[in-house]
């Protein structure tokens, strides 16, 4: 099977990896993930959002905080609904916004691929999600690096994209069971 190349990429920020349609029949789409782009998976996270969910949610006066994983890469596959994903690093200097559904992805409002994708993000990327009006479901294929710590991996940050100043406003482990 021949796999398609990466659709879009900003080094040390993101890659958009297309799924390959293996089979389409009436009412069924069967896609394959190119495992060359995911040679190692340390965790698989199932994440289900209700309609219009924010992740992370508001904390105090910070209405749209951010996550940032210092020792984990994320590989997001949206299975149902729509996710609006913002990404930012001080090195890149601007927010990249994606709208991802099971069958297409837009970058900064422009359709970049008509088909299923994995949105892969590097370590140290600030990210946040807003779910569409019908809710959403996804899988994340996590790649964990040395020094990964579940207690700090989901810390929530206040980030000023004008000055690149950031601070932890909630310790991630406080939301874990």
Located regions from the model:
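Histidine-centered metal-chelating micro-motifs
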Residues: 116-129
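Active-site region of the double-stranded beta-helix
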Residues: 1-113, 133-137, 142-177
């Amino acid at each position: 099977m021949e796999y398609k190349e990466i659709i879009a990429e900003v080094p040390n920020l993101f890659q958009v990896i297309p799924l390959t349609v293996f089979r389409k029949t009436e009412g069924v789409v069967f896609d394959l993930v190119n495992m060359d782009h995911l040679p190692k998976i340390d965790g698989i996270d199932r994440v289900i959002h209700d309609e219009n969910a924010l992740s992370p949610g508001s904390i105090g006066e910070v209405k749209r905080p951010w996550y940032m994983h210092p020792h984990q890469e994320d590989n997001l596959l949206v299975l149902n609904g729509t996710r609006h994903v913002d990404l930012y690093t001080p090195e890149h200097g601007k927010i990249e916004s994606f709208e991802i559904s099971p069958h297409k992805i837009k970058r900064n409002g422009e359709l970049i691929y008509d088909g299923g994708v994995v949105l892969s993000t590097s370590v140290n990327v600030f990210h946040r999600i807003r779910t569409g009006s019908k809710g959403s479901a996804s899988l994340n294929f996590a790649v964990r690096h040395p020094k990964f710590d579940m207690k700090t991996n989901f810390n929530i940050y206040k980030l000023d994209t004008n000055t690149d100043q950031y601070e932890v406003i909630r310790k991630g482990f406080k939301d874990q069971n």
